[in-house]
Amino acid sequence: QKLCERPSGTWSGVCGNNNACKNQCINLEKARHGSCNYVFPAHK
């Protein structure tokens, strides 16, 4: 399981196989991808 601990930070839960993290990053943070570290793509 991967934690969504990225600097953009509206999600503090666990990135599972569901779309919760993806949707929140895309919908609320205007991310291009579902990855929650879209602000710093090289920082994981």
From Swiss-Prot:
> Is Secreted one of the keywords UniProt gives this record?
yes
Q: Which UniProt keywords apply?
A: Antimicrobial, Disulfide bond, Fungicide, Plant defense, Pyrrolidone carboxylic acid, Secreted
Gene Ontology annotations of biological process type: defense response to fungus; killing of cells of another organism
| A UniProt-annotated Pfam family | Gamma-thionin
InterPro entries, per the entry: Defensin_plant, Scorpion_toxin-like, Scorpion_toxin-like_sf
Q: Which cysteines are joined by disulfide bonds?
A: 15-36
Localization, per the record, is:
Secreted
Please give the Gene3D superfamilies that the UniProt record associates with this protein: Knottin, scorpion toxin-like
List Pyrrolidone carboxylic acid occurrences by residue: 1
Which cellular component appears as one GO term in the record? extracellular region
Q: How does it assemble?
A: Forms oligomers in its native state.
The family this protein is said to belong to: Belongs to the DEFL family.
Q: What does this protein do?
A: Possesses antifungal activity sensitive to inorganic cations.
Q: Tell me the protein's name.
A: Defensin-like protein 1
